[in-house]
């Protein structure tokens, strides 16, 4: 969960803002809107590898589980906060997919 205490945010935010600006600048030199995906993947991978190297030195199973769990939680929280609202708006705008309403938890049992 990304909700760290407020006093821990400013020292990180200035670096995050600079990295984000650098990623956007680099993405603008590449063809296609989706080119930013590779840059984000690279930046996140390098950040994780560097933090593990500086803090722990070597990978251990518990650390692999911890890092992959964090990445999984990041994806889930982003989906919950951003994608779910977007998808719900599209469902309202364009209509539901046939079959979801009939099999959803809000339907009475037959």
Regions found by a protein language model. Name each.
Residues 1-110:
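Solvent-exposed interaction surfaces and binding hotspots enriched for charged
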């Amino acid at each position: 969960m990304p909700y760290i205490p407020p006093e821990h945010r400013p020292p990180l935010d200035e670096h995050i803002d600079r990295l984000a600006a650098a990623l956007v600048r680099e993405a603008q030199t590449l063809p296609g809107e989706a080119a930013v995906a590779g840059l984000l993947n690279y930046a996140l991978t390098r950040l994780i590898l560097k933090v593990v190297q500086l803090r722990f030195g070597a990978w251990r199973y518990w650390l692999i589980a911890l890092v992959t769990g964090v990445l999984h939680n990041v994806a889930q929280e982003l989906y919950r906060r951003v994608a779910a609202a977007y998808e719900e708006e599209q469902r309202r705008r364009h209509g539901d997919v046939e079959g979801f309403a009939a099999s959803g938890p809000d339907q009475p049992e037959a």
